[in-house]
């Protein structure tokens, strides 16, 4: 019997479920000012939804699901003409507006207006596979060289003040090597970078051993948006990222996770929370810290925490002193911190911060054609089918109902039947959404 990579008792299973979650995903537009390899969403010009449509989606979300924040995504939400009004709307509903963007359209003036509207934070997606749209100076830069661009946005948010700052990066087979450097860069800027997210690359490739169907109709695999005509590494797993990070940070320790829908030891969302400053990481919180934070926050606000404010994350020192009573990881961090002070007591004037490192492992293809999704998916979004039925669906697979009217199913090529109709191959175009 194979053993899980992490002992089951070492991690806190995040309590997020379909009706009670930390995050919900809103897409006001599918238009983007970048064309990125690896993106899950088709770039559709002039696809902006009206504010009435967006409000309807928010109404449906709130009728079905508790959320601490709304991730405003796309497309790129900063090209959405009503973005300031949308941020105000989300804020007025008692949720935290988080903008997921590539940052190209962000100016200091727009940032200031968004802060006045109530924006809580930004998650910037920056990686070396992003295509046309950025300035020429960023072309052909590797992940480490792009830290200069990341720092530009982190400092912009820090200058405005009071806005959470996160970065996403897709991890490919040839960029895995850079992950430890990005984690080290995040520590260097732990005072202004709150979260680093690593999303493992997933695409359909020529050797994918499945055929694809909607109903009984076979779909040409090259018609599916998220496909590559060349072979790629599409089976990276969260433990592989942990092993790579530990080459630079041997004590790196996750404390919480979301499992897969088909496998309990698929670490779909794997979260590490570390405490430190620019000089040193003192330690990593344990599962009891995560359980306590989630339980207390839910007791107080009747929803689970997603993003914390920069002010809260700057309380690393008080976190160590207070919560060391309850959590082994925090207790170890406190011991290391006290040793750090003994060497030079004046170090007490340096703030300690909390910083999150999150690894996301998208859908995995099972041998029978099933897909193991994130159990309690945080990035659930809205879909209205051709019959007008509103649904909560996976944002990472939204292209399927958008194009085909339903989610695709996969049949292993070696098991495929020979019935009539399965030889009929259809090409689909977009436009099935009743909206």
What are these regions (language model features)?
Residues 1-16, 266-435:
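Radical SAM enzyme core and accessory elements
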Residues 2-20, 37-38, 206, 210, ...:
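Conserved N-terminal glycine/acidic-rich loop preference
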Residues 2-30, 154-163:
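N-terminal/domain-start segments enriched in small and hydrophobic, helix-friendly residues
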Residues 15-52, 64:
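Canonical Radical SAM [4Fe-4S] cluster-binding loop centered on the CxxxCxxC motif
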Residues 32, 99, 390:
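Conserved, mostly hydrophobic/aromatic
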Residues 55-72, 80-200:
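Radical SAM/AdoMet-radical enzyme domain recognition
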Residues 140-147, 155, 159-347:
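Radical SAM enzyme [4Fe-4S]-AdoMet core and its adjacent flexible, acidic
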